[in-house]
């Protein structure tokens, strides 16, 4: 349930008949930008929990940004298994989101928006112990250099949990440029499921991303302290929040 946004820096080199070298000048961004992204991942983890029963997923999306205002919107899809495993149906997660990002100051950035997680024909509202899996969250984020803190608040029930409206997720992390196309990814988060302490937990990730030019590769170790009863797969009993290695290959067009 986590959309992929791979940011690209646009740089233009100035050339001419000068007998001396000049610094490259960054090109002005166009008013409107669009991009597509696609990925294959060894295990789709969202907030530390496997959405695919510890198996691979195919993912892709589209993003639009209006640079003068900072407004953006997009959509993203992934294959999943958890809704069907829980007794419902469907094998797709479809996310729709919109928001606004910008700078509070030269050093501090912000991002605020709304995100809808749609699970077409999930049918969990017909399964005892669940409600409709479709979820809407509003979120706000502040960034300082490579570090950020983000809070997401559910304005509906959360991912099929009964009476879970107003659940919240706190996300703290940093994406540190290590040079040569490498980025170190650090994350810690806490999911509070309203009225359900057994389903609340903390997750973490330590990873590295490498831009190979043609594609981007990411390798991460992901884990949680989630309850094994609350997050065991109904299909085979496997714990969906166990510590594991995740590999992703992605491409932005």
Predicted features and spans:
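Detector for outer-membrane/organellar transmembrane beta-barrel domains
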Residues: 126-195, 221
């Amino acid at each position: 349930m986590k959309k992929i946004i791979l940011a690209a820096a646009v740089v233009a080199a100035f050339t001419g008949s000068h007998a001396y070298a000049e610094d490259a000048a960054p090109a002005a961004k166009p008013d409107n930008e669009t991009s597509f992204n696609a990925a294959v991942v060894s295990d789709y983890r969202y907030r530390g929990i496997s959405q695919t029963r510890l198996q691979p997923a195919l993912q892709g999306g589209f993003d639009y940004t209006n640079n003068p205002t900072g407004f953006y919107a997009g959509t993203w899809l992934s294959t999943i298994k958890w809704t069907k495993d829980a007794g419902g149906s469907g094998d797709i997660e479809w996310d729709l989101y919109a928001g606004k990002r910008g700078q509070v100051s030269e050093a501090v950035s912000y991002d605020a928006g709304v995100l809808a997680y749609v699970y077409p024909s999930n049918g969990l509202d017909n399964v005892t112990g669940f409600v409709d899996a479709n979820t809407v969250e509003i979120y706000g984020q502040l960034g300082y250099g490579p570090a950020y803190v983000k809070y997401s608040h559910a304005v509906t029930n959360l991912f099929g949990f009964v009476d879970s409206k107003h659940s919240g997720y706190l996300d703290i992390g940093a994406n540190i440029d290590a040079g040569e196309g490498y980025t170190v990814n650090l994350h810690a988060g806490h999911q509070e499921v309203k009225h359900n302490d057994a389903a609340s937990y903390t997750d973490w990730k330590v990873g590295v991303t490498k831009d190979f030019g043609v594609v981007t590769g990411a390798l991460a170790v992901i884990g949680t302290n989630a309850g094994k009863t609350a997050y065991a797969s109904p299909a085979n009993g496997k714990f969906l929040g166990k510590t594991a290695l995740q590999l992703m290959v992605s491409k932005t067009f």
